[in-house]
Structure formats: C-alpha cells, structure tokens
C-alpha cells in the first residue's frame, strides 16, 4: 500500500526502502527504486491526485502494493482517497502495510514430538502366553529290523528350529535368542489373564495357557497314553487361595522353559500402589505450588499395582563428547518443551495496533526525518512476541544454545537485546553470536554515549565485549549493570535427585530490571559528544520506549522465570549444559515485540499440560535406561559367548534405534565406538544377567532338540557298519564319542592344520570332529551305495576344506523305498562317516507338569497422575516464589 506526506515534493525526497538491510545493500536498492518511481511519476499524477504528494511504497515481496495502480477505474481512486483521509487510517496503514514485518516462526516437527509421546511403559510385555522354546512332538519308533512300529514316542523339540550350522553361528544364534528374550521378558505375569479352559477336565477346570491345553488334548487322544495320565489330565484345574490373593495353575513345560517362567514370576517389577506413592510421584515443587489445587482420588483398590520407572541419572554422560547424540536429544526436548510452554495469545497481549499508535506518538513519527527510527516499529506483532516467549523458555528447559539475529542499525532491537542479556544467562547463547550482539550494543549505544572510541574487538579474545567495557566505563550504574550481565550464569542445584539449572534470584523477582533501567537512563542523559544530534535523539527515544514499560518488563521477567521453573519441575533427566551443535535462532525484533506487547495478564501452564510434560519425560527417561540395560547385557553376552567377529557397532545401532528419536545412519562412527566403550563399563542388571546364565547353562539341551544340526562327525579310513537307532532305523549315527580321538572343528578351521587328522586316518584310527554341522538326511539305499567312495576323508586330505563338510544321515529302514532291497540282511550297509547326533530329551508327562503360582488378580496402572485432579487459581492471583503476584502491574 502507499501513504503520503502532505506538502512534500515528490522530486526532492529519496525513496526509503529495505530498512532492515545493511547500508551498502540499501544504496543499490534505493537507486533501483528511484528509477522505477521516475518512470511512473507521470502516470501516478494523472490517475490519483493533482496535488503534489510523495508516494512511498513498501518493498516487501509478499504484499501487493496498492500504490501500483494499473489502469484503475475512478472507483479505485476514490477508495484510495478514503484510506488516506484520516490520521487513524494513516496509522493503520503504517501498522499493517509498511512497518509490519513477518517474523519466521518455529515449525514444530510433529514426527519427533509424536515419537516422544508414543514412548509408553511397556504394556506390550503383558503376556497372554508363557514363554516357550520347546514343544513336544511325536516321532515314530523303529524295530530292530528297521521296520517302523505303529507306536509313537514324544520328544521335546524346538518350537522354532532355526539353528544355523557352524559353532560360531550357533553361538550367535544364542545371542539373538537372548536379545529376543530381553525384548519379550515381561514386567509382570498375571496367570489369570492367560488361563484357558481344560477341555478334558471333569469340572471345567483351567490350565495356565492355550499351549498347555493343546498339549493336554494331544496327549489325551494318543493311544499310547496311560490311563493314569488321562485321569490326571481330567483332574487338572486351578487352585485358588482367595484369602492370600493367590492362584495356582497347572502347566506343561520343558524344564528349561519352566526355569524361565518361574524366574519371570518370582522377579516381577510390579509393586503395590497406594496414595502415598502417588503423592510422592507428583513433583514436590508442583505439590507445594499454591497456584495449583490438587485433589487425589483416595479410592485405590488394594490390588492396585504400578511399575516403578527407572530414572537413573547420567549413566552414559551423552553431554560429554557426544555432540551429535546430545544435539538430537536437546532438539527433541526443545520440541517437546515448546509444545507445553503456554501461548501468549492476542487477548493476553496489548493490542498491537494500540501499542504501535502509542509508540508512534512517543516517537513523534509525523516529524520523522531519520530512517533508523522507523525501524523501531518494525516487526512488532503478537505472533513474534509469542514465538520469542516460547523460544526463551523452551531453550532453557532443553538447554539448547540460541543464536541472535539482529540488524545493527535498529537501535530498538539492540536496546531490547540489553533486556535479553540481562535476563537470560550468557551460557544460553552461541559465543560468536553473543560477542557480536554485545559488540553492537557497545559500539552503537554505550561507547558513543560517553564519547569513547569504537571498540576494536579481536576475534578469539577470551573476554567478551561487555567484560572489556566493564573495566573501561567509569559510570557506576552502567558498570554495575555490565558486571551483573557478565556474571549471569545458571546456578546448578540438585532438586529431588535431578540437576536443575536455576536462575539468579534477582532475575526471578524482577529486581534486575531496575538495575537495567538505571543504566539505560544514565546512557540517555549522556551527551554523545562525537555523534550528531539526530543520532543522540534516536537512542534517547528508543530508551524512552523501553523505560515507559518498566513495570511490564519487571512482570515479563517474573513471568518467564515462573513458567521456566514450574516446567523445570517436570524435567527428570539432569539438565547438563553443553553448547549444542545446532542452535535455535532468535530475532531481536521478536524480543522487541515481546517487551512492547506484554500486558498484565498472567499466563501459567495448565496442570494437565504439566502432567503430560512430566509423563512424557518419565517415559522417555525410563525407556532410555531400560535400553541401556539391554545393550550392556548384549555386549556382555557377546563377549562371554566368544563372538570375536561380532560387530559391537551393530549392538550400539540397535540401542539407538530403540530410543526412537535418533537418525542412526547419520551418527558419526567415532561417537558409535565411544558409546560402545562407555556401555562396556556399565554393570549388567541382575535380571538380565540371571536370564543369560540360564541360557548359558542349557545351550547343549537346546542344540540337542534341533533337527537342523548335528554335533559332529566321525570319519574313518575303513568302513563302519550302520547301526540300529530307535528314532531312525538303520543309520550311520553315533550317540556318543567314547573311544574316539576328538578335535574341535572350529579350532581346526581357524588354524588350518590338517596334518594331525591325516596321520590318524592313515594309521586307521577314526577321528571325531566336534562342532555344529548341517544335519542332512538321505534315505535312499542307491545314493548310499553311490557315496561309499566319496568320503569326507578325501575332502579333508585333498581339498583341505572342512567348511564343505556336510555329514549325511543314511536311513535304511521301512520308510525307505529301497528297504526291501536289503530286507534279506545278506548285505550289511556300511559308511566311512558317522554323524554324531545327541538324543533329544524324551517327553515325560510327570516331569513336565508344573504348578505355577501368581497373584489371583491385580491391576497395573501406567499413568499414576490419572488419580489426581488438578485446577489452578485465577491467573491474576497467581503468585511467584516470593509470595507476590507474578504480574504486579495492573
């Protein structure tokens, strides 16, 4: 849009555009705009008014310039005259079209916020089935002559048989099994939830889970099952002891599975929940805050339970030497904090229009001839004020480093920056940005006021410009303010076991603003001896605008401090302060907006917002510690299983992925390995260590139940006769290695020394190679005869390749199509190899029936704050820590 200065000559006044650019850029732009105006002079004079008036257009790209009239009609000319006819309309033009600048606001990263809020206590670990590795399976029985009987026998086999071949790979399989158990390990087991009806029961009894019921059905229907076992199954039912809140359920489990589930039952994480626990769960500062009225539901059932969150502090010290990881954590904390900092809505702020009118009157804008003073009003809007308020508090809560964006020629921004540096500790700003801002304030306002020469600051100087100026300035009030600002640091205080970064008491109660105002008034009274009068007047007017709002600035400082400290009570991780890799940008024009538009309305977080913020922090912190425990356990297990090829980096990557917020591929390798080293130093949590020891003690039993691998192979120079085996018939299987010289297959492959094997075979001594090998079955007699000469011995001696070894199970029994070729027993089948395969554990019903005990019933509550109803006092009555209203200026 356009506005006019009455009585001004169009030819004499320069075009004033691009007010926020540096002077060099401004000159180029002014020349361009003047040329454009000269081309349009004649057209405008014809189409608008005959009087000589200046038309100044705003150069913003995103605003359509109403002053650019393209062959407009007479009605459009009338509308333009109406807009310009009153002073009020004229000021609205200034506010909305010319002097208003859109400040880029923070774009909330919803995906990160959602990831944080989606981290919940592990409800998925509420099991509906018992943990099982084994299941019983029926296998046929073979007679002495190799014919299959009609009878079957039950053996324990793996539910999911995915064992690889090779000793190293098998150990890696056990590591993956351990990892899977850690993921599935339940925090609590309530057998009543998983119990199902026993179909064979006489009195509608229940067994512990559906798999137990299926096993009972299969055994009950098996013709080989004894009558006493059937009667026992018919009597299987739960036993309830209501007075003790206990129930026993019958279960069918392999002894190893029973050991796991018994351990889970005896080491549950649930604890009794009562009102005292809920009371202590609420942060103490929220409980004691008179602005919040909390009421607790006292009707907790006696069966209420909860899982205590794991809130250990600083186990990995990610703030120390993990720049990339720490930056991600602080970024996600910043996004979360911004979502909970209350908004300064337009109704809580002074009307932007009214405030700009008042500022225009204070500045006497009608008489302005200096371009810099028009910038005082640039960028003042409620959106920028709200953005600044949220940025300051969220950055302090998350300890995110801020960088300042400002224009040196905008004195109002620099004066607002003096308030900012007074209130916000220096640590919060990027060092380079802080130095640039301080240097601009010193060279634009402070030194010119006293007639001192410009400060020439050396890059890399350990002192900041304010620290240098403090030593050189003689004026007590200004030096006193500089001293406070230079020493404005967070005080580290441990509250409720959490390291908090607290503000200086003078900032919390707002008294420091009086110190700032004394310094500003001293500066405005100085003569600026080396500067023109207009320069001095501009600075004085800027200071006047800020000093007119002394009361509001005190209130603003108290409001920022109160909101910060109240939300800080909900932070559960230590607030470690380290400069972050990336920074949050803060424009000083938005600080001006906040200073100028803050009203007398108190804005404090709602209790629901506080509870939400607290819950999200607790859930993330607890999940963080649990995932650390998992990673430490996996690293320890990999070392104890001698997984020398295992890449520890992959374990660390899995750990970071499970924390949800990290973009793992972007994390530098050096930080990955440093993280690995820190994880190695931590002790393994007790439950996880016990579970690993259970696996370690039973590895052989688990291997034995697999159909995929054999435990070794016996090779000989002369043929060995096939023997009868009850599970397979006539086969080349050895069930023990008694009498054989044994060599570890993994060691053999690592060393490559086959001389010992060759010598033993040539001396006609069979040798047993012990290790996990693929268990391949072949039942054809024809193929057996064909392979008599293709012995493993030939491969060992000639090819020197043990990894090609695939022992074959030669089946000669009634299942074979060729069985009747050898039924006369005149020909005795032989083989130069024997497969060493351990016998799986037979299924014994009596040994597999276990009674499991758990609570009859309890209810686990994940959100303890749901029992608390909360409200706030009237915001206008809200008081700060000093028992005075937060906002005193009414």
Swiss-Prot record:
Alphabetized InterPro entries for the sequence: Rotavirus_VP2
Gene Ontology terms: cellular component: T=2 icosahedral viral capsid; viral inner capsid; viral nucleocapsid
Entry comment on modification after translation: Sumoylated with SUMO1 and SUMO2. Sumoylation of viral proteins seems to have a positive role on viral replication.
Region entry Hydrophobic, spans: 404-424, 432-452
Keyword annotations of the record: Capsid protein, Inner capsid protein, Repeat, RNA-binding, T=2 icosahedral capsid protein, Ubl conjugation, Virion
Disulfide bridges in this chain: none
Region (Disordered) residue spans: 1-46
Domain of life, source organism: Viruses
GO molecular function terms attached to this record: RNA binding
Biased composition (Basic and acidic residues): 19-30
Ubl conjugation keyword on record: yes
Location in or out of the cell: Virion
Site keyed Interaction with the intermediate capsid protein VP6: positions: 232, 236, 849, 851
Repeat recorded as keyword: yes
Assembly information from the UniProt record: Homodecamer; each decamer is made up of two conformers of VP2, called VP2A and VP2B. Interacts with a VP1-VP3 complex. Interacts with the intermediate capsid protein VP6. Interacts with NSP5. Interacts (via N-terminus) with NSP2.
Protein task: Inner capsid protein that self-assembles to form an icosahedral capsid with a T=2 symmetry, which consists of 120 copies of VP2, with channels at each of its five-fold vertices. This capsid constitutes the innermost concentric layer of the viral mature particle. It encapsidates the polymerase VP1, the capping enzyme VP3 and the genomic dsRNA, thereby defining the core.
Family designation: Belongs to the rotavirus VP2 family.
Name of the molecule in the record: Inner capsid protein VP2
Record lineage: Viruses, Riboviria, Orthornavirae, Duplornaviricota, Resentoviricetes
